[in-house]
Design a protein with these regions (language model features):
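Rossmann-like dinucleotide-binding cores of NAD(P)H-dependent redox enzymes
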Residues: 56-103, 222
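Cofactor-binding loop segments of dinucleotide-utilizing enzymes, especially the Rossmann-like FAD-
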Residues: 48, 71-74, 193
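FAD-site-proximal beta/loop scaffold in flavoenzymes
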Residues: 9-40, 125-198
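A conserved short coil-to-beta-strand element within the FAD-binding core of flavoproteins
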Residues: 1, 98-111, 120-124
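Rossmann-like NAD(P)H-binding beta-loop-alpha module
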Residues: 28-63
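General small-molecule cofactor/ligand-binding pocket signal
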Residues: 14, 94-96, 116, 189
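A conserved FAD-binding loop/helix module that cradles the flavin
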Residues: 55, 194-222
Length: 222
């Protein structure tokens, strides 16, 4: 998801989902492809989770001179696995913690050229148990950036919940399921991120196997 700040609609600013999907599944690193991905020399990846690490390491491997993680908390509060952070550092990834973007500026062609970052400090712990990020009043910096990948979290695609009558969803928009991954509609099973929110491929596969077993049992009993 995006952060709702000025400049997020500029060329060169994209979500981690779009970036990684295009690079890994759509041959976007091929300049002759239908939708080639933009290459950046100064790439900022916003976020501190595993997806952010995937995106920033991808940018570095694609030739970025500076591939930088921008995270609003300290490194200790990063949700990414420790080994992911260490692997990123080993590849030359730079980390700018306690900073948060508040605006992006464009060049004359409408492509992002720089990011305005708010300097942050840490306050009291929030509901996640991590210390909450607090803006330092009057302190910002401007950094060059010809590409920005936003990896601050995911939200469920609203199309399915809104288009399927009678489907129970949580207040966060995820599909509510029972232990067999069956939804409020007996013919519909769900798993992965649409149930859990942002999670891992491993958990999604496990959900799929559980749902498949439940579907097989339901069909076999008829």
């Amino acid at each position: 998801r995006f952060m709702g700040i000025p400049g997020e609609n500029l060329n060169g600013v994209m979500s981690s989902n779009e970036y990684l999907t295009r690079v890994n599944l759509m041959d976007a690193t091929n300049a002759a492809s239908d939708t080639p991905v933009l290459y950046g020399k100064n790439v900022l990846v916003i976020g501190g989770g595993n997806t952010a690490m995937d995106a920033v390491r991808t940018a570095k491997r694609l030739g970025a001179e500076h591939a930088i993680i921008v995270y609003r908390r300290s490194e200790d509060e990063m949700p990414a696995r420790h080994e992911e952070v260490e692997h990123a550092k080993a590849e030359g990834i730079e980390f700018m913690t306690l900073h948060n973007p508040i605006e992006y500026h464009a060049d004359e062609n409408g492509r992002v050229k720089e990011a305005v970052l708010q300097v942050m400090t840490l306050g009291e712990p929030d509901e996640s148990g991590r210390r909450s990020p607090v803006p330092v009043e009057g302190k910002t910096i401007t950094m060059p950036a010809d590409m920005v990948v936003v990896a601050v979290g995911v939200s469920p695609n609203p199309i399915i919940p809104k288009s399927v009558a009678g489907l129970e969803v949580s207040r966060k928009g995820t599909i509510v399921v029972d232990d067999s991954m069956r939804s409020s509609l007996p013919i519909l099973y769900a798993g992965g991120d649409i149930v859990r929110g942002g999670a891992t491929v491993t958990l999604a596969r496990a959900d799929g196997r559980k749902a498949a077993a439940a579907m097989h049992e339901a069909l076999s009993s008829k």
